[in-house]
A protein has these predicted regions:
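Short, conserved catalytic or adaptor-binding loops enriched in Gly and charged residues
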Residues: 1
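Acetyl-CoA-dependent GNAT
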Residues: 4-93, 103-110, 114, 143, ...
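A structural microfeature
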Residues: 72, 132-135
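Glycine-rich phosphate-binding loop
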Residues: 94, 98
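Short acidic/polar active-site loop segments enriched in Thr and Asp
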Residues: 117
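Conserved beta-strand-loop-alpha-helix junction that forms the acyl-donor binding cleft
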Residues: 121-131
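Short Gly/Pro-enriched turn/cap motifs at secondary-structure boundaries
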Residues: 138-139
């Protein structure tokens, strides 16, 4: 079964996205940030007000719905030469099922259709210590974030 992507535009969906973001961010980042700092990050970056401000600045948020259940969300912004995938979060039980890959492929198709040459995103390097390009020889990650860029052919 393929998920549906529901555009977040109305206030009730903005609030639902903010609630989901809080749940997922607390689950994903609890290992890396103290609770109070994480609460502040969520409030500043993924609260209903922050999401509404993003939407006002041309960021497109989508809820990921599978079988009538909201299982995640993603957000992207079209830039001059690229589509910037800003957020992609799925509930734990839906990870590893190629749903994220399908979202990225959808973004690639959209970018191509808009005449953009690439899709890019950043992710927390601390979550992916097995990525060799992000590691130094001593096994430490030199930066908190790694940029992934895919040039469209």
């Amino acid at each position: 079964m393929k998920p549906d992507y529901k555009l977040v535009a109305k206030a009730k969906y903005i609030h639902a996205t903010a609630d989901l973001a809080s749940e997922l961010w607390h689950e994903v980042y609890k290992r890396y940030y103290p609770a109070k700092q994480l609460d502040t990050l969520v409030e500043e970056l993924q609260s209903a007000d922050a999401i509404e401000e993003d939407i006002d600045n041309d960021v497109n948020y989508f809820l990921v719905v599978l079988g009538g259940k909201t299982i995640g969300y993603f957000a992207w912004k079209m830039e001059n030469t690229a589509l910037h995938l800003m957020h992609l979060y799925l509930k734990p039980e839906y990870r590893g099922k190629a749903l994220g890959r399908d979202i990225v492929l959808s973004c690639e198709r959209l970018a191509r259709g808009e005449g953009k040459g690439r899709v890019w995103c950043t992710f927390k390097a601390l979550r992916y210590r097995n990525l060799k390009p992000a590691e130094q020889e001593n096994g430490t990650v030199p930066r908190d974030e790694v940029v992934f860029e895919h040039t469209l052919g």
